[in-house]
Amino acid sequence: MSLQPLLVFDFDGVILDGMDEYWSSSRKACLSLLRGVFLPEQTPSRFRQLRPWVHHGWEMVLIAAFLQESDGPLQRLGVDAFAADYDQQLRAGLDRFGWKPSLLQDSLERVRRQAVSGDRAGWVALHRPFKGVQERLAGLEEEGVAWSVLTTKGRDFTDELLDAFQLRPVRLDGRESGPKPEVLLRLRREWALKGFVEDRRATLEVVLETPGLEGLKCFLADWGYLRPADREGLPEGLDLLSTSKFAAPLAIWP
């Protein structure tokens, strides 16, 4: 095991805010699959509202497809009722459009590859680091703590963005590395894990229940893409990490 402690961070919604890129790429991927439909270039408010429910990138392409409908379930139910039955709505949407997650994920990544190769600067400009995050990550080294990234985003795209914003984690695990609890188990065998910072509560709850990850400190990033009730009734072992606590020395984190 490495003598150096390691703090693990999710990427989207924790380090970087890429909301406009999520929409831009999801919109283009959807339009490549549904010819002749209209989707606005500006990020719709309903897309922003549903983003906290998204686990994998392909879901955003399907949400774009829901948004182009004039009388679909999202229009009939409204965002709140749709989100309350989110997983079932995804399954029904895949059936209705005749799609598979792999098709949507491939379409999304193709759009992103084209954007990176054709206009990298424009693609990067659709992202921004959350306020204070770059400085705090740089400060971890002074505390003797390394940091890594664990994300469901493709590794290559994440690496492009880390490079663009001059962020240098000691390790990067993208969606290709497998489910987050499995990656954390591997990391725990190699490092002295200090904690995992994530903005998806459901992921953190799975981590807490994973055998072999007992005692791992889990932090819910208060500045991320949180659902309305995510901050309420947090289970033991899961702490809400505010921006002020995040900026403070690790020794006084919750």
Q: Which residue stretches match the model-derived regions?
A:
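Generic enzyme active-site microenvironment
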Residues: 8-10, 196-197
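Substrate-recognition "cap/lid" segment bordering the active-site pocket of phosphatases
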Residues: 148-195, 201-212
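Short amphipathic alpha-helical segments and helix-helix/interface helices
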Residues: 134-141, 184-185, 204, 208, ...
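Short acidic-hydrophobic, aromatic-tinged amphipathic segments that line or gate anion-handling sites
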Residues: 172-175, 237-249
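Extreme N-terminal starter segment of soluble prokaryotic enzymes
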Residues: 2-8
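Alpha-helical substrate-recognition element adjacent to the catalytic core
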Residues: 14-159, 164
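Short, charged, surface-exposed secondary-structure boundary motifs
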Residues: 177-185, 227-235, 250-253
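Acidic, Mg2+-coordinating phosphoryl-transfer loop and its flanking beta/alpha structural elements
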Residues: 26, 152, 195-242
